[in-house]
Amino acid sequence: MSAVPLKNDKPVEAGVRTVTVLGATGSIGDSTMDLLRGARGRYRVEALTANSNVEGLVKLAREFDARFVALADTSYFDELKNALAGTGIEYGVGESAIIEAASRPADWLMAAVSGAAGLKPALAAVDRGATIALANKECLVCAGDFFMQRAARAGACVLPADSEHNALFQALSSGNRDELTRVIITASGGPFRTWAAADIENATLAQALKHPNWSMGRKITIDSASMMNKGLEVIEAACLFALEPEEIDVLVHPQSIVHGMVEFSDRSVVAQLGAPDMRTPIAHCLGWPERIAGPAAKLDLVSIGQLTFEAPDFARFPALRLAYDALRTGQGATTVYNAANEIAVAAFIAEKIRFGAIARLVEATLNGWVRAGNLAPLASADDAIAVDHNARNMAASLLPQIAAKAS
């Protein structure tokens, strides 16, 4: 049994639904809170969390009358305590408080804590059989098989909140899983879609941050420029929908209007289209199994004029090829892929390596991991976190060598 519902057969819940938002002050959290703001009376906020943004968290807690708030950074305890004095809102700090927020009774939970820190809170929600809008990549990239199996056993419902996976989720409801022949994830191509390899190699931070279509955080925008983000999405799709690498294709689609397609055995292809606005997939998750009104712009195909598609260039964007390699190697390798990329992106932002060295550091770390024979299956969250930690250390140790080769 899959934790992702491939048929819209869940009964509609009557009355006010309670919601928890993990990562409420981040970009995904901000979009989620905006949707909740427009649907007052339909939802009640149980808990909100943030990393260190006390002011933003307290402002949201007061606005939505949250019952509990949590900060990951323990150094802000006194500031949080003082800001909530007299409100009656419960609060806590540290990992245990974030897990408590996820464990509290809520009908629906947005899992948008970034990084490996989001894994244990998401598992806490899974274990109580919650409906989870999943926006944390690490739950799938670092612990996908384990996470999805645990969700299925607990009766949790996992709804993909990322635009591409939500598109596949919607399209898959048009047929049965055994009728699927492949899924197609689209990619904008990022700011370097038409650049020569030599120019991509030496791209600056400012150039990498100029995404043509989406407004996103700094890290994910750089990942889009390298197509590392699309590689991560390939891995996520495999975990969410129990797909083999050969069942997942990527097409470059510069307009970012078609977000995903599913091909069935009769060669019918069902696509999901929409303006590039993260509030659309989040609204789909928030309203599911119904649909709620969303604030995104109407899709005007006449003004867009044309939709074009290109095959991805694995030579100019090796990060995408590496994702398929890691997926075929196994769960530990996908964890290494993600961890090494985070080290590489941080080094690029700090101007320690060229843009083109991001993928080279990831490849070197993957090769080193495989040579060391570190291929045991992951059986727990602690296993995944340990692999993530060790892979980061390996990538950091390889960084000077990669930087020297590029200089």
Swiss-Prot record:
Instruction: Write out the entry's keywords from A to Z.
Output: Isoprene biosynthesis, Manganese, Metal-binding, NADP, Oxidoreductase
Q: Which residues bind 1-deoxy-D-xylulose 5-phosphate?
A: K137, S163, E164, S188, H211, S224, N229, K230, E233
Q: Which residues form the signal peptide?
A: none
Quote the Pfam families the UniProt record gives.
Answer: DXP_redisom_C, DXP_reductoisom, DXPR_C
Give residues annotated as binding NADPH: T25, G26, S27, I28, N53, N136, E138, G217
Name the Enzyme Commission number(s) assigned to this protein: 1.1.1.267
Top-tier EC class: oxidoreductase
Q: Which residues bind Mn(2+)?
A: D162, E164, E233
Gene3D superfamilies to which the protein is assigned, alphabetical? 1.10.1740.10, NAD(P)-binding Rossmann-like Domain
Keyword Cell division assigned: no
Its cofactor is:
Mg(2+); Mn(2+)
Query: Could you tell me which InterPro entries the record lists for this protein?
Result: DXP_reductoisomerase, DXP_reductoisomerase_C, DXP_reductoisomerase_N, DXPR_C, DXPR_C_sf, NAD(P)-bd_dom_sf
A molecular-function term among this protein's GO annotations: manganese ion binding
Q: Which reaction does it catalyse?
A: 2-C-methyl-D-erythritol 4-phosphate + NADP(+) = 1-deoxy-D-xylulose 5-phosphate + NADPH + H(+)
Tell me, which GO biological process terms does this entry list?
Answer: isopentenyl diphosphate biosynthetic process, methylerythritol 4-phosphate pathway involved in terpenoid biosynthetic process
Pathway in which the depicted protein is active: Isoprenoid biosynthesis; isopentenyl diphosphate biosynthesis via DXP pathway; isopentenyl diphosphate from 1-deoxy-D-xylulose 5-phosphate: step 1/6
Per the entry, what this protein does is: Catalyzes the NADPH-dependent rearrangement and reduction of 1-deoxy-D-xylulose-5-phosphate (DXP) to 2-C-methyl-D-erythritol 4-phosphate (MEP).
Q: Which family does it belong to?
A: Belongs to the DXR family.
Stated name of the protein = 1-deoxy-D-xylulose 5-phosphate reductoisomerase
- Origin organism is Nitrobacter winogradskyi (strain ATCC 25391 / DSM 10237 / CIP 104748 / NCIMB 11846 / Nb-255)
Which gene does this sequence derive from?
Answer: dxr
